[in-house]
Amino acid sequence: FHMYDANYAISVLIFVVVAAIVSTLMVKLQRQMQLANKKREITSKINEIGNGFLNVSGFDEIKKYSEESLANLTGKRVTVLLKENQKERFTNELAEWCYNQSLPCGHGECQFPNDTGLYIPIKNREKTYGVIVFDCQDWSLREEEKVYVDTVISQITLVIEREQLSREK
């Protein structure tokens, strides 16, 4: 391969550099598109969950629907423990501690970090209604998943408050 003009060599070099830049930008764009699609999918799931809560009544239905929804959202095994009255006690001591302290505990948290379960209270500013237990055998909730779970928890608290108001009538 022999070039007669140095301008051809410079042109080829410029084309190679431009091709590398375009390729890098395309890879970044593809990653951003994948991320946007994933966020859209999760937002859609959260909206679906919220719509499903509109048709739920009774603590047993709330518990069952919450477990199914969180399991679909995270892809992990989830148990929801609700207290209909303050005198009840959970049989699980860590769940009881989480409920009483209104703090997360278990896997990856400051309190009881060696446990395989992650215990997250279902609460609003004034009151705790129950505990969500994630089975964290061989995995952890990522920060972005915690945000989605917190969104669902706020929906659960609204449904529980609605249920309690309807019982008081």
Which functions belong to the PLM regions below?
Residues 1-9, 95, 105, 169:
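Short intrinsically disordered, low-complexity coil segments enriched in acidic
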Residues 1-33:
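Transmembrane alpha-helices and immediately adjacent membrane-cytoplasm interface residues
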Residues 5-8, 41, 90, 148:
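Short acidic-hydrophobic sequence patches enriched in Asp/Glu that either
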Residues 8, 12, 41-45, 69:
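Membrane-proximal extracytoplasmic alpha-helices
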Residues 14-22, 41-44, 74-75, 127:
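Membrane-embedded alpha-helical core segments of multi-pass
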Residues 15-28, 125, 148-169:
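Signal-transmission/dimerization alpha-helices at domain junctions
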Residues 24-65, 168-169:
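Membrane-proximal helical linkers
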Residues 48-159:
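GAF sensory domains
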